[in-house]
């Protein structure tokens, strides 16, 4: 199929076969909380500014707080963000800080739901007031 306007032309083709069942990635996870998008985004930006290296951010989630930290040879940054709902289990998980920041910027809401399962499983972030949701894959932390 060809889609054309005065400014551009897009050519596409139908891919044969079954499309990946991405809905299975968004299953309900056992650990869920709600957090202020602005507070988490601001904390992530401050943490990322402290290091020039590509370092993972470590989330330490317990009770009603999310501790985030970035550590490299010259930086040891820690900050705590309050959760709006207690989380039932403690969890430590790492993420690419840049990806978390870009993901949070894509949302247009005040609060986000965060769902987790384990340090090796993705985090699901969903808008509190819409159906928009995304997955952020974890990275290994030391």
Residue ranges, per PLM feature:
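DNA polymerase processivity clamps
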Residues: 1-15, 28-142
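Specificity-determining recognition surfaces
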Residues: 21-22
